[in-house]
Amino acid sequence: PEMSRGLGDVYKRQELLREAKRLGFSDFQIARFVLKPEGTNMEKENLAVRARRKELGILPAVKRINTVASEHPELTNYLYMTYAVQGYDVNYYKNEKSVVVLGSGAYRIGSSVEFDWCGVQALQTIRKEGYRSVMINYNPETVSTDYDMCDRLYFDELTFERVMDILE
């Protein structure tokens, strides 16, 4: 209730914007709800919310997916981004060259396995050429999301906001 009443104050109240992000609202949804840009360029409004969020230091944390029920220290490359906690589970190597591959997402008739195979081939070529490979995909059914296919695997949505958060 307070969230819906107060989103108009998003540019004034850092804690409200942080809470909106923690609850899962995208920058696009916040822009549409707060700025109500009927007939305007939503890309511009979306970028305005993104810029304000970054200016306020509201950034997602990168966490590892726990695949072993905390039985021993987690060292997988399965990652996701969240606003629910702070702190990173991984270190970033800014001096190492990385190439990001966008995954196939959900399987669709006529464009599923073939598109995933393209991603796998891209990841193998990236590694062969000596670059760090990063895959962003939310479909665990694909070969490209196997743990040994890439150096970093983000199980996350394929949206402008999420891809940019990972790239930055």
Mark where each language-model region is.
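Single conserved hydrophobic/aromatic residue that forms the stacking wall/gate
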Residues: 1-11
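Short alpha-helical "recognition helix" segments of helix-turn-helix
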Residues: 19, 30-31
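Intrinsically disordered or highly flexible coil/loop and linker segments, enriched in small
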Residues: 26-29, 132
